[in-house]
Amino acid sequence: MDATAAITGNVDKTQIPPLNQKRILAFVNHFLVSTCTFLNEFALGCETKFVEMERQLQKTEAALIILEAKLASIPTEHHVATEATEAPAISNQQRNEEASMVDTTEPPTTENPTEPELPPESVGVRACEDQRYRKFFKMVQVGVPAPAVKQKMQSEGLEPRILDTPDLILADGQRE
């Protein structure tokens, strides 16, 4: 029998000897074992990567919680401005008292510590002072990228364009 004849199909198939069953069984066994080994290693590798990603996600979540706590502890611009105006007012009062003690012949000047004049109240609240938007302005102030903050604002159902205009007066603004 010619080897090329088996390929071309000009062979009487009744004359071809049967395949050895033990050899076929060995090939099938080898294929199954190697395939199972590959799939087990692949699944183990995937599981390892999932565990690693979960750890990274937990670390990121912990860092986010810490960052939110730090943001909550930062005073807002309104509180800082109030404290800054109170300190000069106190020092002006002390100067006035010292001046009146030193110069008894001259009448004391009528320098009353003036409280900062607030502009006439608008109909609403500035966006940066609004209770809903304050934490987002803090996040930008601390250094969180603005696109990420806008995405978070949108996920909470707020208008992200307000972040670009902090002095915008909101008619439906909420104060503390």
Swiss-Prot record:
Provide the protein name.
Answer: WASH complex subunit 3
Query: Which source organism does the UniProt entry give?
Result: Drosophila melanogaster (Fruit fly)
User: What residue ranges carry the coiled-coil annotation?
Assistant: 47-74
The record, for InterPro entries, names:
WASHC3
Q: Where does the record place Low complexity bias?
A: 104-115
As recorded in Swiss-Prot or TrEMBL, the protein's gene is named CCDC53
Q: Name one GO cellular component term.
A: WASH complex
Per UniProt, which keywords does this protein have?
A: Coiled coil, Endosome, Protein transport, Transport
Pfam families with a match to the protein in the record:
CCDC53
